[in-house]
């Protein structure tokens, strides 16, 4: 305790001595010492140093090398001690900072004149940062690569302090972190560094024509500098197969090149059977020089070197077929495939089969249907029409109620329903169901049929007659045919050249594994029809058919004659108006032109009894006119030296002169010496007289005389033995022709103007 008090007293005395103003000197000390700093090249750095009670000389050292004691630090232009002596501030200012300034600095004060001890500050490290140079990619601006073959891209950034940080970014803006190798190499000055980053890239099609960039930066400058390179990637074709729909139809099921128009079919849609299908193969490749090949179920298609393939008639055999398109270029080959989904109508792959079963046994009927989409199958029992199943297989226990006929019906939307039937037969003894009385014709071949339902199938069928079994040894008169029918058997006994003694009662016996059945069948003779009656009947039928044929032919010919002729041909017409005058135009040659007979109607109004008719028949047409009067007839006929022209009748009313002009045909009746009448037609021409009435000038045509016995002879109008009588046919007897028979009626280019027709030649 005493020792402690002594120590405290000693310390107090020492403190009082140091703080006393009467002390002979005071120690110098640092009020502020320099600290470690970091600066970028070109920046300004100040290392602080303040000294209290400075007695000695102050200087800065750089890596233990003294810089000088004066404030301007001569010899070091970028260095200076800033501050004031009064404040004891001797801070070191460096501007601009250079890489050489990267060192350890210390502020030192030498001992004072009165023996004050020297003092030194702590070392302060100045770290100088240098931004890196712009990065460079050693491969240049473009690198050529092949898909899936690795390449290396190197990015170098030089002169950074610290070494530059390098970041890789792909063409999509994604930062790459994998498959990168980063190394730092010091420069010879051992202060700066070269940073190198190698990107090991596996090129893909997506990288084609994209830019990869590397970014370099360090703590001296956080603004990155970058370099980029464009990647040209050669890649194998990228293939896509599309199924295109087309119009229904197409024949032959052939596979060929490009087809017609089509519609893109979405995935999952079905192709209708028998339609035309076009498949398109799209390929993206670099280089683009490619070769196409098509396959169906790995079988190459001949001529399939195009971008499209057409199946002209797609059938159900193409359902689920794999259509593959293979495309190849210099880099490699690739492929794509599409599975065809064909919609087709249902068809039976396996029809239900009839079965034989015992009561209580279990049977299974199978109905396999091929269709797309899958069919709806329904089993129906007949005759109840009750649905008993809806699956491919129908299994049930056999009984009297379940035995019978079953229908399998398959339905697919958009297609016709199909059905098939099968029988389930109960096994038992046979039962004969034939007619008990059958007939034959004496002298002809007779047949007796014995039908028996037999499940299982009959193993023996026999015939007996008058107690004796009929067999192959019974003579050549008999033969037996046995045919299997659904659910039974049919036996036919054939009797050749049957006679009366062959007719009678026959027994048919059917035997199977479950029993037998016997039926007695009566064979009766039916009366034959006599040969004479057969012949008479046949002749009657033939005669009736012959008469009927003749009547039909006559009816058809008569019906054809009643048909109207064409509009420009007048084959026959009659004119009967107040005098019984009739005319008939007969062609001398069937190839003649009927249109030479023309009817011209001038104006739109024809008064009653006034006819405007113009005939100009060719020579080969003969016009025969007959006029009945007092039991005699006059026949007028022109030959090809004369023309019969019935000119247009014109009626003009003039209010001042009250004149009327009428052109009428003239008829000359000639009495021959033989008592017959001959006539001539005189073509008339209008000659106006002073009194306003027209006179007629005529040309005489040749006349054909008609003798009482009906013969005709050509007569000359100049014969001395004839007497000519002039008879003017009144206008009421003028010929009337339906204007629709005119060629002008149907052809406006043949219609003439209102000018008058040329007059006929004047008679001499």
From Swiss-Prot:
Subcellular location: Membrane
Taxonomic path: Eukaryota, Metazoa, Ecdysozoa, Arthropoda, Hexapoda
First and last residue of the signal peptide: 1-19
Membrane topology qualifier: Single-pass type I membrane protein
Polar residues compositional bias, start-end: 692-701
Listed InterPro entries: CD80_C2-set, Cell_adhesion_signaling, Ig-like_dom, Ig-like_dom_sf, Ig-like_fold, Ig_I-set, Ig_sub, Ig_sub2
Glycosylation sites: 211, 313, 393, 400, 507
A biological process from GO: myoblast fusion
Residue spans crossing the bilayer: 534-556
Protein purpose: Required for correct axonal pathway formation in the optic lobe and for programmed cell death in the developing retina.
Disulfide linkage: 49-107, 155-214, 281-325, 367-408, 450-508
Effect noted on mutating residue 16 to L: In strain: Sn34
Protein name, UniProt field: Irregular chiasm C-roughest protein
Tissues in which the UniProt entry reports expression: Postembryonic expression is strong in the developing optic lobe and in the eye imaginal disk.
Biased segments, Low complexity type: 702-719
A GO term, aspect molecular function: identical protein binding
Extracellular side: 20-533
Every Ig-like C2-type domain range: 21-120, 132-230, 237-343, 346-419, 430-530
CC annotations in GO: adherens junction; apical plasma membrane; cell-cell junction; plasma membrane; protein complex involved in cell adhesion
Annotated phenotype, changing residue 16 to I: In strain: Mz10, Mz16 and Mz36
SMART domains, sorted: IG, IGc2
Subcellular location, principal: membrane
Organism this protein belongs to: Drosophila melanogaster (Fruit fly)
Topology Cytoplasmic: residue spans: 557-764
Region (Disordered), start-end ranges: 640-660, 691-719
């Amino acid at each position: 305790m005493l020792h402690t008090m002594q120590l405290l007293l000693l310390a107090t005395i020492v403190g009082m001595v140091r703080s006393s103003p009467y002390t002979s000197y005071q120690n110098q000390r640092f009020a502020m010492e320099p600290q470690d700093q970091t600066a970028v090249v070109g920046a300004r750095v100040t290392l602080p140093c303040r000294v209290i009670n400075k007695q000695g000389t102050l200087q800065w050292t750089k890596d233990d090398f003294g810089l000088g004691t004066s404030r301007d630090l001569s010899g070091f232009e970028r260095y200076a001690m800033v501050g004031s002596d009064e404040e004891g501030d001797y801070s070191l200012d460096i501007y601009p900072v250079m890489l050489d300034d990267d060192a350890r600095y210390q502020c030192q004060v030498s001992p004072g004149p009165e023996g004050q001890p020297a003092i030194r500050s702590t070392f302060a490290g100045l770290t100088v940062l240098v931004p890196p140079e712009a990065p460079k990619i050693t491969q240049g601006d473009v690198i050529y690569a092949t898909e899936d073959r690795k390449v290396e891209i190197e990015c170098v950034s030089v002169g950074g302090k610290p070494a530059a940080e390098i970041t890789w970014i792909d063409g999509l803006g994604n930062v790459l972190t994998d498959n990168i190798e980063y190394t730092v190499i010091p420069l010879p000055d051992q202060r700066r560094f070269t940073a190198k980053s190698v990107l090991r890239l596996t090129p893909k099609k997506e990288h084609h024509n994209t830019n990869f960039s590397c970014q370099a930066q360090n703590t001296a400058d956080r603004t990155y500098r970058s370099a980029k390179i464009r990647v040209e990637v050669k890649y194998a074709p990228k293939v896509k197969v599309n199924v295109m729909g087309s119009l229904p139809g197409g024949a032959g099921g052939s596979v060929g090149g490009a087809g017609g128009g089509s519609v893109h079919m979405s995935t999952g849609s079905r192709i209708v059977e028998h339609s035309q299908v076009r498949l398109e193969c799209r390929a993206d490749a670099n280089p683009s020089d490619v070769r196409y090949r098509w396959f169906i179920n790995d079988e190459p298609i001949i001529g399939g070197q195009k971008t499209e393939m057409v199946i002209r008639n797609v059938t159900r055999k193409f359902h689920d077929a794999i259509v593959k398109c293979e495309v190849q270029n210099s880099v490699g080959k690739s492929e794509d495939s599409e599975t065809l989904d064909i919609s087709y109508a249902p068809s039976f792959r396996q029809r239900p089969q009839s079965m034989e079963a015992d009561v209580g046994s279990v049977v299974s009927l199978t109905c396999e249907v091929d269709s797309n989409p899958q069919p709806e199958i329904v089993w129906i029992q007949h005759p109840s029409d009750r649905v008993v199943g809806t699956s491919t297989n129908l299994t049930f226990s056999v009984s009297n109620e379940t035995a019978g006929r079953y229908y399998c019906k398959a339905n697919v939307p958009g297609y016709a329903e199909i059905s098939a039937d099968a029988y389930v037969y109960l096994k038992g003894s046979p039962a004969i169901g034939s007619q008990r009385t059958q007939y034959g014709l004496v002298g002809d071949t007779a047949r007796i049929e014995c039908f028996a339902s037999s499940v299982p199938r009959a193993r023996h069928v026999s015939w007996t007659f008058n107690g004796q079994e009929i067999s192959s040894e019974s003579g050549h008169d008999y033969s037996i045919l046995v045919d299997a029918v659904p659910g039974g058997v049919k036996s036919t006994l054939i009797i050749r050249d049957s006679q009366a003694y062959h007719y009678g009662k026959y027994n048919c016996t059917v035997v199977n594994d479950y029993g037998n059945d016997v039926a007695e069948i009566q064979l009766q003779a039916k009366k034959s029809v006599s040969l004479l009656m057969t012949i008479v009947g046949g002749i009657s039928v033939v005669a009736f058919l012959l008469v009927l044929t003749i009547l039909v032919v006559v009816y058809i010919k008569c019906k054809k004659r009643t048909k109207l002729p064409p509009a420009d041909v007048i084959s026959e017409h009659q004119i009967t108006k107040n005098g019984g005058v009739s005319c008939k135009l007969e062609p001398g040659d069937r190839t003649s032109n009927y249109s030479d007979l023309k009817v011209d109607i001038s104006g739109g109004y024809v008064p009653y009894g006034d006819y405007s008719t113009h005939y100009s028949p060719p020579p080969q047409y003969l016009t025969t006119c007959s006029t009945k009067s007092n039991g005699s007839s006059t026949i007028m006929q022109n030959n090809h030296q004369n023309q019969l022209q019935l000119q247009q009748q014109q009626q003009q009313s003039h209010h001042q002169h009250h004149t009327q002009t009428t052109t009428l045909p003239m008829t000359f009746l000639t009495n021959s010496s033989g008592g017959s009448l001959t006539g001539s037609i005189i073509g008339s021409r209008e000659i106006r007289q002073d009194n306003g009435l027209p006179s007629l000038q005529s040309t005489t045509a040749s006349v054909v005389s008609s003798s009482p016995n009906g013969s005709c002879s050509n007569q000359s109008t100049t014969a001395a033995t004839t007497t000519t009588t002039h008879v003017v046919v009144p206008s009421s007897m003028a010929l009337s022709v339906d204007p629709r028979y005119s060629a002008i009626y149907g052809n406006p280019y043949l219609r003439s103007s209102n000018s008058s027709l040329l007059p006929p030649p004047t008679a001499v």
